[in-house]
Curated annotation (Swiss-Prot):
The gene is mutS. The keyword ATP-binding applies. Belongs to the DNA mismatch repair MutS family. This is DNA mismatch repair protein MutS. Transmembrane segments: none annotated. ATP binds at residues 626-633. One of its GO terms (cellular component) is cytosol. Keywords: ATP-binding, DNA damage, DNA repair, DNA-binding, Nucleotide-binding. GO terms for biological process: mismatch repair.
Length: 886
């Protein structure tokens, strides 16, 4: 609690003093201050919120001589405004009225009940169904000389309770953040660690929050253990410091304990296949190069029936395990699902999964005591459906360890289900304040209060009949409204028959309204019964939430099993629908893909040409040549994607596939600059190449696309040659090396482990047809002009390019220029041409009649125009011959 000096309150109203105390505790956070049916913001917060949310900024009076600027949002619509602010990286403190206005002296008591930040979201309205939200803290470890030796990371998915730790090299921070993708990053005040731009909203917290000893103890307390040896975290001092800051911050935002954070996983970078930011981007795993969500590998694979499954699938794609054991277990389960008997078919299983609620996030809200009535009814209905789901699984678990494990984990917590069934109404209201949440029969007192409220109608009918008989007033009516409560209405002409015990309540133009002692007694009982029923229901609901807390571990176990089952079923559906096969694994060096296909591209086109890809101990680098648009990049990407899919545990788009160990996948594909970072296209290219050359191992898969094209021809060729040699001689990795430098096709003569392959194409007139087939050997032509023509480059430009190309080819032939490219003939053909140097030189300039013919569009010619053109062409030919041209 921040203490303000008395001078800070001088001249302020009591309510403003209350607000200023609260704001002082949340200086960098927007404070939503509850006033009646609105959340109000004041002063600078009001100005900022008005700008960000397009709210009306008002001004009401002054406090201590300062105009009070205000902006507000309705309490019933607050979630949509919170969602917008969080998306912008803002944090919001929700300040509620906790006192009773009727009994309060001075301002109603208020306090901040929670702080909504980008990394601590749990409300369904604020969360994306298919994306996890992580809060991450980072703590740098230093040696005795003050040099940074590692960075400890701790990250938490508050919605599920998943907590993870890792320690990384300082230069691996960007890669780690790209993999985790935190929504919010906690760093210490004064820390100099450079967080990559766009990595997440950055929150500075006091440096003492990262104290290692305190963090270790806080982590032990959270996990209810004496030490961290059992988790393998006892030596991760920097990560423990980060975990301490993270847990302190997360608990403060929620205003309570994190009861569902009861497990810890330590991640090791050698546990997963390494994917740096460039690789994740270039392979378009979960986001296209244009920044859209589709078409990507994730969008193709995600046919999950639950949101839990969709989130787990995303996690698997970004965390492919290096060990093939996990992949083989998953593929074994997929095979069992595909071979399931008719009564437990894959379709029937997936149909049952579609009825499953988001148990993972409901459990998180339950642990934070923020679960809503329909969360509990959804949890109840899901648990009730588990026995039938397990029956389907039990019919197909044979020889599938993963399914056996899932089946065992899906045993519903019986006591939890009994409590939910007895306590929660079949179809509860959305909010507890609306009533109708607690089931009838759960609490006798609540049932009695409800009976009083619900039986008002019959009592009024009976009273009206009795009073008509007693008074003889046939048109007497007993009614109710919110302003005056219950009353007996008598028309003006019948008032002389009114008994003495009638007391006037309201006079109208044509009638009088009365109340009797009996009606007054009932009114007090009925109105208080409704209020008491809502209060009783609120108390009972809070009791149910408390009673459910012991079942959180069981709920988390069920959620994890359901998510895994859903992903496996989605993999099986994709394998069946898209004709994919189960890959195999070997401990030997090599990759064998027969008739492989790019999974995403294949789904976008009518026909896809499948291709083989083979690596081994004697074949480590493939030099890929061929025309632009011929399919080189697609072939390279599909090889990497098929490998990644295999290690994730999916079937793959191929006739067959076998993989040896893979530790990392690198890509250097495409051209893009980094203007904000002050890096040119070529600098970006070289930076990515440097990372590959420094880190690739014999078990790495490397994709190099047209390296060296961002500088002069000779510089680029020299770099490409040297990089290819280094990858072969030093790194020894699997390499797909696409290039337009024909000189590189001589590399296999020096290194037998290199091989040439090319993407074929055929000319058709002045056009080109891409065959997209990968063949052994180098290409002999680039077809650059034909591709330019396909792209719509104007015909005059194409003609000029052809003329200059002919000139360059002639110059190259006569001067024996060492600079060659794919416009040139292959070496053997070039040698034959040089042997014929005594032959008459061929003019580089085309015949004028041919030029004229190329400009003709026959469809636009009339018969007379065609005849005139024929004479013109004859004149051109004769004139050309007369000038002595051959």
């Amino acid at each position: 609690m921040t203490t303000l000096s008395p001078e800070a309150f001088a001249g302020h109203t009591p309510m403003m003093q209350q607000y200023l105390r609260i704001k002082a505790d949340h200086p960098d956070t927007l404070v939503f201050y509850r006033m009646g049916d609105f959340y109000e913001l004041f002063f600078e917060d009001a100005e900022k919120a008005a700008r960000l949310l397009d709210l009306t900024l008002t001004q009401r009076g002054a406090s201590a001589g300062t105009p009070i600027k205000m902006a507000g949002v309705p309490h019933h619509a607050v979630e949509q405004y919170l969602a917008k602010l969080v998306k912008m990286g803002e944090s919001v403190a929700i300040c509620e009225q906790i006192g009773d206005p009727a009994t309060s002296k001075g301002p109603v008591e208020r306090k901040v009940v929670r702080v909504v930040t980008p990394g601590t979201l749990t409300d369904a309205a604020l969360l994306s169904d298919k994306n996890d939200v992580y809060l991450l803290a980072m703590c740098t470890g230093h040696n005795k000389r003050g040099v940074a030796v590692n960075i400890g990371l701790a990250w938490l998915n508050l919605a599920s309770g998943a907590l993870r730790l890792a320690e990384i090299e300082p230069d691996q921070l960007g890669t780690a953040l790209e993999r985790i993708r935190p929504a919010e990053i906690l760093t210490a005040d004064g820390a100099t660690d450079a967080v990559p731009a766009g990595a997440g909203a950055i929150k500075r917290v006091p440096a003492w929050h990262f104290d290692i000893a305190s963090g270790t103890q806080r982590l032990c307390d959270q996990l209810d253990v004496a030490g961290l040896d059992g988790f393998g975290a006892h030596s991760l001092t920097s990560a423990c410091g980060a975990a301490g800051a993270l847990l302190l911050y997360a608990a403060a935002t929620q205003g309570q304990q994190l009861r569902h954070v009861r497990s810890l996983k330590v991640e090791n970078e050698t546990e997963y296949i390494g994917l740096d930011p460039a690789t994740r981007r270039n392979l378009e795993l979960t986001e296209t190069l244009r920044g859209t969500e589709s078409p990507t590998l994730y969008s193709l694979l995600d046919t999950c029936c639950t949101t839990m499954g969709s989130r787990l699938l995303r996690h698997w794609l970004h965390h492919p395990p290096r060990a093939s054991v996990a992949a083989q277990s998953r593929q074994q389960a997929i095979g069992a699902l595909l071979d399931a008997p008719a009564d437990a078919s894959l379709d029937a299983l997936r149909s049952a999964l579609r009825q499953i609620a988001d148990v993972e996030r409901i459990t998180g809200r339950l642990a934070l005591l923020s679960a809503r009535p329909r969360d509990l009814s959804s949890l109840r209905d899901t648990f009730a459906a588990l026995p039938a789901l397990r029956e389907r699984i039990s019919a197909i678990v044979a020889n599938a360890d993963a399914l056996t494990r899932v089946d065992a984990a899906l045993a519903p917590p019986a006591e939890c289900l009994d409590l939910l069934t007895s306590a929660i109404a079949p179809e509860p209201a959305a909010m507890v304040r609306d009533g109708g949440v607690i089931a009838r029969g759960y609490d006798a007192e609540l049932d009695e209060l409800r009976d009083i409220s619900e039986n008002c109608g019959q009592f009024l009918i009976d009273l009206e009949a009795r009073e008509r008989t007693r008074t003889g007033i046939a048109n007497l009516r007993v009614e109710y409204n919110k302003v005056h409560g219950f009353y007996i209405e008598v028309t003006r002409g019948q008032t002389d028959k009114v008994p003495d015990d009638y007391r006037r309540r309201q006079t109208l133009k044509n009638a009088e309204r009365y109340i009797t002692p009996e009606l007054k007694t009932f009114e007090d009982k009925a109105l208080s019964a409704q209020e008491r029923a809502l209060a009783r229901e609120r108390a009972l609901y809070d009791g149910v939430l408390q009673a459910l807390l012991p079942f959180i571990p069981e709920c988390q176990r069920v959620a994890s099993a359901l998510a895994e089952l859903d992903v496996l079923a989605a993999f099986a559906e994709r394998a069946r629908t898209l004709d994919w096969v189960a890959p195999t694994f070997t401990d030997e060096i090599g990759i064998e893909i027969e008739q492989g296909r790019h999974p995403v591209v294949e789904a976008q086109v009518e026909q896809f040409i499948a291709n083989d890809c083979r690596f081994g101990a004697e074949r480590k680098l493939l030099l890929i040549t061929g025309p632009n648009m011929g399919g080189k990049s697609t072939f390279m990407r599909q090889t990497a994607l098929i490998a990644l899919m295999a290690y994730v545990g999916s079937y793959v788009p191929a006739k067959s596939a076998c993989f040896g160990p893979i530790d990392r996948i690198f890509t250097r594909i495409g051209a893009a600059d980094d203007l904000a970072g002050g890096r040119s296209t070529f600098m970006v290219e070289m930076t990515e190449a440097a990372a590959i050359l420094n880190d690739a191992t014999p078990q790495s898969l490397v994709l190099m696309d047209e390296i060296g094209r961002g500088t002069s021809t000779f510089d680029g060729l020299a770099l490409a040659w040297a990089i290819a040699r280094h990858l072969l001689a030093q790194n020894g990795c699997y390499t797909l090396f696409a290039t337009h430098y024909f000189e590189l096709t001589q590399l296999p003569a020096e290194f037998p482990q290199a091989a040439n392959v090319h993407l074929s194409a055929v000319e058709h007139g002045h056009g080109i047809v891409f065959l997209h087939a990968v063949n052994e050997g180098p290409a002999n032509q680039s077809y650059g002009l034909q591709v330019a023509q396909l792209a719509g480059v104007p015909a005059p430009v194409i003609r000029a390019a052809r003329k200059h190309l002919a000139y360059l080819e002639q110059q190259s032939a006569t001067q024996n220029t060492p600079q060659l490219d794919l416009f040139s003939a292959p070496p053997a053909a070039a040698a034959d041409e040089l042997e014929c140097a005594d032959a008459p030189a061929v003019s580089a300039l085309p015949h004028p009649a041919l030029e004229k013919l190329r400009d003709i569009d026959p469809d636009d010619l009339k018969p007379r125009d065609a005849l005139d053109l024929l004479y013109e062409l004859r004149t051109l030919v004769r004139s050309h011959d007369a000038d002595g041209h051959a």
